[in-house]
Regions:
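N-terminal assembly/interaction segments in proteins that build large macromolecular machines
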Residues: 2-281
Length: 281
């Protein structure tokens, strides 16, 4: 019997939606491994594919910016919601975004900043605010052959989701391209894709999904000769769930995000994206 805690059961229930007893059984059967327990539940048909919930983070705030061909995103973490939504804290993350936009993200902690360095300033802010404060995820895109856009979802007075996207093969002054880029960042915030294209999905992730779907299909009593075909069809559903280009556009699910962008003509394509949410890794 695997060793696990009540917290493990709660985490598994939260991520899979499975019942408490099923979660306990899954943890027992997999020696307490959370990822293995998720797969066990799915193979038994007791849970669907789940969005990666990730490690639970502290509180914090996110800010984003676009300045010409440069887009930047900074996550600043804190211990409490009270500090994270304070004017002092939100002002700091906004200034850090401007810093990253202007000076890049390399060696951020050592960069000169307001009479000291970024790292030292954040340490001073932690002392002033009375709790642990740190720089979380930092993303910066710079384009010369396309355009960038950003979106920040605000909740409780501070940014909790930040998105950046870069489109290549488009004119940054084209109104239609600008509109599509903004539609894409809004879509990413809502749909939480993991990958840009199918080729970006790691081989081990595909094999893990195929193994789970194969056993699930077999447990459903499907004819052995049909299993491979059924599994491949279900893998296509996996791609539609997690690959940005293949997701149905939130405003019109009959249209994929990839076709929305390619409809701009020429070599228009999604080059890359980033989505950061407070509380998720």
């Amino acid at each position: 019997m695997g060793e696990y805690t009540a917290k493990d059961v709660a985490a598994l229930r939260k991520e899979t939606g499975a019942g408490m007893m099923d979660c306990k059984k899954a943890l027992e059967e997999t020696s307490g491994g959370l990822e293995e327990a998720k797969d066990w539940l799915r193979k038994k048909g007791l849970a669907g594919a789940t969005k990666r919930a990730g490690r639970s983070a502290d509180q914090g705030a996110i800010d984003v910016s676009v300045n010409g061909g440069v887009a930047a995103l900074v996550e600043l973490t804190a211990e409490t919601d009270f500090v994270a939504k304070s004017e002092d804290f939100r002002g700091l993350v906004a200034r850090l975004v401007a810093q990253v936009s202007a000076n890049g993200d390399a060696g951020l902690a050592e960069q000169p900043f307001e009479g000291t360095t970024v790292g030292e300033y954040v340490t001073q802010a932690a002392s002033r605010l009375g709790e642990n404060v740190g720089i979380g995820r930092v993303v910066r895109y710079e384009t010369t052959d396309g355009l960038v856009d950003s979106y920040k979802h605000i909740q409780n007075d501070r940014g909790v989701i930040g998105v950046l996207v870069e489109l290549s093969g488009v004119d940054a002054s084209n109104a239609a391209a600008l509109e599509v880029a903004h539609d894409v960042v809004l879509h990413i915030a809502s749909a939480a894709p993991r990958y840009t294209t199918r080729s970006d999905v790691p081989a081990d992730a595909i094999e893990r999904e195929r193994a789970v779907l194969t056993e699930l299909t077999r447990n459903e009593g499907k004819p052995e000769a049909s299993i491979d075909k059924i599994v491949e069809a279900r893998l296509n559903s996996f791609y539609k769930d997690y690959v940005l280009e293949e997701q149905g556009f939130v405003k019109d699910p009959k249209v994929t995000v990839g076709s929305l962008v390619s409809g701009l003509g020429g070599s228009a394509a999604i080059k890359r994206f980033a989505r950061v949410k407070i509380g998720e890794e």
